Amino acid sequence: MHKHIRKAAVLGSGVMGSGIAAHLANIGIPVLLLDIVPNDLTKEEEKKGLTKDSSEVRSRLSRQAMKKLLKQKPAPLTSAKNTSYITPGNLEDDAEKLKEADWIIEVVVENLEVKKKIFALVDEHRKTGSIVSSNTSGISVQEMAEGRSDDFKAHFLGTHFFNPARYLKLLEIIPIKETDPDILKFMTAFGENVLGKGVVTAKDTPNFIANRIGTYGLLVTVQEMLKGGYQVGEVDSITGPLIGRPKSATFRTLDVVGLDTFAHVARNVYDKADGDEKEVFRIPSFMNDMLEKGWIGSKAGQGFYKKEGKTIYELDPVTLTYGERTKMKSPALEAAKQAKGTKAKMKALIYSDDRAGRLLWNITSQTLLYSAELLGEIADDIHAIDQAMKWGFGWELGPFEMWDAIGLKQSAEKLEQLGADMPGWIKEMLDKGNETFYIKENGTVFYYDRGEYRAVKENKKRIHLQALKETKGVIAKNSGASLIDLGDDVALLEFHSKSNAIGLDIIQMIHKGLEETERNYKGLVIGNQGKNFCVGANLAMILMEVQDDNFLEVDFVIRRFQETMMKIKYSAKPVVAAPFGMTLGGGTEACLPAARIQAASEAYMGLVESGVGLIPGGGGNKELYINHLRRGHDPMNAAMKTFETIAMAKVSASAQEAREMNILKETDQISVNQDHLLYDAKQLAASLYDTGWRPPVKEKVKVPGETGYAALLLGAEQMKLSGYISEHDFKIAKKLAYVIAGGKVPFGTEVDEEYLLEIEREAFLSLSGEAKSQARMQHMLVKGKPLRN
């Protein structure tokens, strides 16, 4: 099937609809955003002399939604410029335009009859073969298609995005009986490769997979809290990062989602369930009281938590009053925290017989049993359920992975002792001697499915570094980095220091990696699969050395860092950097000299050293300045833009924004699906080699010199006089201005790169000896945020 989605239409411009439209715009798909025609004029429209027939009025809702996209946090758009891909309109005047769309997505109110009316309109105006989908979070997709044409049904399915659409990975696809299998296959591939999502196929049941299990787990947690007399803060102490869940844990998650939204999702199942399941999905009375009071969470200013000034209070579910935050106090909990890794932490706590252990057991065991009971009803296999929970709710471990972590056999024995009913398929599994849901052989992961283990089907674009290292081994390794054979004659330099911070160990491994690549490989990728690409240089090491007055050691490290970055730039084989997540300071400097950057769409890049009292010390000043020159800026303008970006420690909110900041060059590329990042980078490195890559020829750099230095200082002085920056900020700015301007040389002087690196290194060393800079470094290491002194 050679289908293409060149244009889309989103019907419904609320938070979810506009968010989906924004995500499509982010990847360059033109989208028509339609909503209903308002009944009345606003006062502002009346003042303008508009009438109900004015197009501005008739398309008001979608126009307003577009304006809100520019103000929302977190930002739905990867760049404000992407609004140019969105065309606002309304469902009456612009219905004819639906025939232009290859994909039409309904995102209106969760009401079956309203949705059916919308789809009748769509069926009338769509072109034959266009894909139509609903973003419903739990209404029957099959029922929505009743009465529609055969071609409509063949091209219809559910596409449930999680909010916010840009950031949350999960896309549940729900086919109906009549959905063409080729359409399901196409949308699955499109969802992963183009939209960048983690796609699972779900059954057409209430709340599908993630919301069904997630809502159950949250309600079970609330019920166990009430039964055991626990406090909100105590519960959140153990249901967050300790067990591989987001920091928001249980009740902060409910505040963010909104209790009103959560209650609606719970009622989807409650209305269709019976027996014990129905009772679990009944909203507890105290939560109904909260709904009546409007205490629905963050958007109302209070929910399970309330912030007054800088103090956060938590709700007592019994008295409905707010008090000081609580934390679980438990010897078993403290012992579990010392265990290494989420799996070990869970196992250490869940079998302990104290308040923390009992709570975790009661919550987890019920959720695991429920997940097992739903197999076949909500999804065909355990892997789909696990992936849905990880991608949709941010769990580190899916239910069946969690079960493996705590020990299936041990937990089953305890459940039987407590009189719980084990699902028949699990009893059968254990009787056959199979004690884990997942096994790994020769780097391939298998999952248990109907009496046998089946290999997890992987997109070839997903590279799992751990599995790769287990099968291919490691070429070289030290404490900070490893050199790995990535396949297809491309090597990978992986950072694995704490926070992937760059120290001498990583610098040495980059040297070794470049030498090995020049001998035996087509190219080198610099990348990893940590939480973030790199948060910067090893600040603790720098601070320790300067506090010991060991400036020679710091000079040596910075010199080696600069030399290594130059070696990357002029490598005989192409080097591709693959940044993602936080890519700050030295992390950005490690990318700038690469032949190409293959960035994840969610790459947050910037030279932020001023926040710790320093300036970039690995050639970042020079490379960013050169990038501006290459975009056609004259030396003065290029210096101004470089200075502003570094002095203000600007960080891009996306890879697209990094390109607009000239951190990425026009030739650099972006991967929407971060799971494909290393594959894309590998392909790019091999392609550069195969098409005759040659390293750049060294050229001199034209600088603005003394004239530029004076202009940069003038701006900094004005900021100081206006109270925007401190005296120490100004001192940093002076050093930075000197480096970017190229020192005290005439305007337009052409200097070599080594000279610029020398004055950069001198400025870095000078600032590192300043007491206030050291205070900033110390503050960042201890508090994790910048000190303005």
Curated annotation (Swiss-Prot):
GO BP: fatty acid beta-oxidation
Organism expressing this protein natively: Bacillus subtilis (strain 168)
Family in the record: Belongs to the 3-hydroxyacyl-CoA dehydrogenase family.
Induction: Repressed by FadR in the absence of LCFAs (fatty acids of 14-20 carbon atoms). When LCFAs are present in the medium, they are converted to long-chain acyl-CoAs, which antagonize FadR as to its binding to fadR boxes on target DNA and thus derepress transcription.
InterPro entries attached to this UniProt entry: 3-OHacyl-CoA_DH_NAD-bd (IPR006176), 3HC_DH_C (IPR006108), 6-PGluconate_DH-like_C_sf (IPR008927), ClpP/crotonase-like_dom_sf (IPR029045), Enoyl-CoA_hydra/iso (IPR001753), NAD(P)-bd_dom_sf (IPR036291)
Keyword Zinc assigned: no
Superkingdom of origin: Bacteria
Known EC number: 1.1.1.35
Catalytic reaction(s) noted: a (3S)-3-hydroxyacyl-CoA + NAD(+) = a 3-oxoacyl-CoA + NADH + H(+)
Membrane-spanning segments: none
UniProt keyword Oxidoreductase present: yes
Name of the molecule in the record: Probable 3-hydroxyacyl-CoA dehydrogenase
GO molecular function, one term: 3-hydroxyacyl-CoA dehydrogenase activity
UniProt pathway annotation: Lipid metabolism; fatty acid beta-oxidation
